[in-house]
Amino acid sequence: IAIFEKDGSLRKNNASSVVRGAGAEASVMSVKADEHGLYAASYSRLGTFEGVMRLNWVTGDIDYMADCHGDSYDVLPAGDVVYAASHSHDCSNIGGFPDVSYHYHNAVAYTNAATGTVEDNHGAGYKNYAGQNATTNLNFYPDFTPGKISGAIQATWTVEGNDKYVVYGGEFLAVNGTAQQGLVRFARRDIAPNKQGPMDKGGAFKVSGSSPRAGVVSLSFKANWDRDDKTLTYNVYRDAMNGQPVTSQTATAGFWERPDLSATDVVEPGSTHRYRVQVTDQWGASTVSDWVTVKAAEGQGLSKYGARVLADGAAHYWSFDETSGDKAEDFVAQRNLTIRGKAYKRGAGSVLGSGASLGLTSDSANKSHAATRVASQAPTAFSMEAWVRTTSTSGGEIMGYGSSAANQSWSRDR
């Protein structure tokens, strides 16, 4: 790539010292420009650079790169977004989707700015651009059915647009499951119909229910996904959908990183209820699961305090109400604790006046503690409530995040 001065002389350009897009099986396929810089779309069969990058007009440096494996054929800068015609199959180097059996994405979008740095290369046979400025792979994943006229099994070849629409051209037969041949137009968000909702629809969105203890119903479901919205809202309804949901939560995830979600409801022990989960994007497009019927276990129900904790929307709740064993159940997210050490006691009365308690010791020879089996990312801020009775006057940590579940954590948050 070369940038020329007005008099025809060559302007200093540092891009070629980083990216080499030339040779028998590598090329810069398209170059576009705007006031921010010069944009290039590249392919390579020699393991150099595939993806999109932006060069700075003044310095000749690479402002950012979208190090996404898979040929890129054309690029369109459109304000704060850059669109590419490609068959991208691995954007994990910039925090995007990973390579899954070479599933091609023929239209992708990126933030038109540097948002971080490229990670160490995740794919064999490609050059490592770790540390270079990177952009972000946006949640824009239309699905194309490729044609066969060229034999390249490539759906999109070009992308153009204006301040209202983005247009892809190529040899495709359908888009998002609807017949659409060779040319397709996508509207910008503010004028788009915004009818593409969560993709696992109706009965395909699976919800399971159980009752782990008296009067408590636990629902489990995997996060849904959406072609153009990464954040979805999950409302859980009991018996009917004409009132307020039992619980509501949001989850932000790409199609490749869908977490397991859960919800908890407190009802009369022995009662039977139907539950349904509605998933909605920020534009109102939604789907609902089938109803799932759950009978709450019989017996002594959750205490008034525990019911209030759940009603307040706690992310986790361990009551330590079990009278035996080495487990402490999480009533909200099923992140159960394992009690470690020998010097612990169960079944004594609780300081809350009802239920049982867990007795631990910090004695150096007989330490005991409780921890989750699976690690999770510590949040930057959170609140907690714990009821404790102690005879110690030396103080110490009651609850927090640490680097070890089995032993003393050398890295912890408090």
Model-identified regions with their sequence ranges:
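Extracellular acidic, Ser/Thr/Pro-rich low-complexity tracts
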Residues: 223-229, 281, 324-331, 390-392
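Structural recognition of the beta-strand scaffold that forms the well-ordered cores
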Residues: 83, 316-319, 400
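Extracytoplasmic surface signature
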Residues: 1-301, 312
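Extracellular glycan-recognition modules
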Residues: 324, 328, 365-414
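Residues within well-ordered beta-strands of beta-sheet-rich folds
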Residues: 220, 274-278, 317-321, 381-389
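Extracytoplasmic low-complexity segments
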Residues: 296-364
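Extracellular/periplasmic catalytic domains that process cell-envelope and extracellular macromolecules
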Residues: 32, 76, 308-313, 350-352, ...
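Parallel beta-helix/beta-solenoid repeats that form elongated, surface-exposed shafts/blades used
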Residues: 163, 301-307, 410-413
